[in-house]
């Protein structure tokens, strides 16, 4: 999942500005990535993250938003449920590596999330990962195979 050659401006902001910028979510947002999708100027405008978050939340948000950047950079045209599911799943893998009681709580919350896009998306991605032998490269290859032709 190489995105090391991309400049990604990250800006910490307050809740009000962040939620004003993210008009589409219709809910509480604590991180978002603003993209320029015009082919002539395609790129990452900036990543906005709410200020003063606890470490575990900050890390999962940065992971989540970096996965959106990776998906954008690789021109994947995934349905929202698959894209958000992959983002949530990558957060989950990081939480798993933390091996703390707090990380375990956040992992459990991902399984219990009732939102169709985020919760079902996560559970579908997690199930596919297990079905594919718990191999992240195979999971990514499967998602890449869905790339829209240009």
List PLM regions with ranges.
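Auxiliary, metal-adjacent structural segments of Zn-dependent hydrolase domains
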Residues: 1-46, 52
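Short pre-active-site segment immediately N-terminal to the catalytic Zn-binding motif
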Residues: 41-62, 74-78
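Helical anchoring/docking segments at protein termini
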Residues: 47-48, 65-68, 112
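Intrinsically disordered, low-complexity, Ser/Thr/Glu/Asp/Lys/Arg-enriched terminal regions and linkers
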Residues: 51-52, 69, 89, 93
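Solvent-exposed, acidic/flexible segments
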Residues: 55-60, 80, 84, 115-122
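Active-site recognition of the HExxH zinc-binding catalytic motif
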Residues: 60-74, 84-88
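Post-HExxH zinc-binding segment in Zn-dependent metallohydrolases
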Residues: 75-116
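Pan-zinc metallopeptidase signature
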Residues: 107-150
């Amino acid at each position: 999942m190489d995105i090391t050659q991309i400049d990604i401006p990250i800006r910490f902001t307050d809740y009000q500005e962040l939620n004003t910028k993210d008009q589409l979510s219709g809910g509480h947002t604590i991180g978002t990535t603003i993209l320029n999708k015009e082919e002539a100027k395609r790129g990452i405008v900036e990543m906005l993250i709410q200020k003063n978050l606890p470490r575990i939340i900050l890390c999962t948000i940065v992971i989540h938003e970096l996965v959106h950047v990776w998906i954008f950079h690789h021109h994947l045209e995934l349905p929202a449920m698959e894209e958000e599911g992959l983002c949530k799943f990558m957060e989950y893998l990081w939480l798993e590596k933390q091996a703390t009681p707090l990380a375990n709580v956040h992992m459990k919350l991902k399984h219990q999330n009732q939102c169709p896009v985020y919760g079902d998306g996560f559970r579908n991605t997690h199930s596919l990962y297990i079905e594919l032998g718990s191999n992240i490269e195979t999971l990514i290859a499967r998602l890449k195979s869905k790339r829209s032709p240009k």
